[in-house]
């Protein structure tokens, strides 16, 4: 399995480009640099498999000349030409299959690799990046843009490269037979280049506009789906429908303008090439009239010119799709080359995290905010201690938890874990020592068993059952027809809030973590569910360093220490009874 994953990771190809801009075509070559051999083999087999179209033109001309000028040719030539064309046509079956096979291997691998690399990069990007980037837009990049890049790759390998091969061979054959006719053919190139340059910038901009509108629409649809319970509860369905309709209207209008521009491009190229084809017919006929060629040669050159027109037309016809593909390449670079990754780059891997924390003058400010949400925050926590943070909304409680998890990095001050600066720790190793239970825990689509053992496929049944018992979850499992193998639905939608919380606690327990983080873990529960979850949490917290954020002050009564926060600073600290005895800020919060 590890080998498969490594071959799908293109991250190294973009390491030196982080934070820079890379041209789409350069990006495409990076993606295919490990598949040059496959591309070369597909081009070779295309050249062989496509040979009938060139040979048939020559054979047709030869047959016409043989029957038109019997005094100059023998019937032996007739039969040789027939044998050649039959053999050349039959070989198309194996060579065409090999041509497509090599293309498919390369394209399928790049498509899977690009999606895998985007997902890897998303896992590395900071939470602030994900906060700024709508999930629907990211989904659009991974699905729609990669699909467009896949289509671009196929157009390049199955249209552009074959067309280029056709042009080289046909012009070469024409040059071999008549340099005058070859020169006439080459005159078509400047007009083709002019057409592309004339339409290129307009098509690129309109494709960009359409792509951005589709990303915005994807974000709106994603948000609308998530908000259905709220909108329905308030009777605001029409408001959401109008929002999506407005986004769709923008896509419709800009898409229509793009379609019209592509129509102008297609019709202009068709008119130009038809005029050239008429010119070729009269030019070669005039040369035959002067005695420079035989009648069959007119047919051959006309056939060659049709091939040239077909090749150039195929390039120009797919050009709008190429523009879309290159715009999608530009789109994925917004993710692949982003520098907004997690800031911690430490490499230290302690054997075991004990759970001692020291915050020294820590300060943090959110992007776009004009004040520090934490200011000179200082605190020391002993291993196995339970510390609860309370205070008004915006006082910095949840920010502290995000700093402990490593989602954020202090702008100033330091955090030490077991005496080691947090910046020197490997975040992956450190987070394996954490368990987090949130107010709204995310469950994955799947069974209860899969959610509890997430990331631990080889956990023993004994440990699993122990975690279920400690999480007070057994009665829930016994009440379900499929027990542990019951599907929870999307985001756990088939379960109650209390049931989801206990599954989250079981998921934490089965990992045997050293540090527990509880963020409003019971605030959304009714009294009965809260009692069950509270009992499970007590099992979870035993002997472990625990950080709690809660608005219900009754839930922090048993904490070893309660830290009262206000405007990013510690204003009180002590046990529940000590703080009540002070009759300070905690006392006020308790009596609100």
Question: How does the language model describe each region?
Answer:
Residues 39-95, 175-180, 292-295:
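Transmembrane helix-loop-helix hairpins at lipid-water interfaces of multipass membrane proteins
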Residues 351-592:
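ABC-type nucleotide-binding domain
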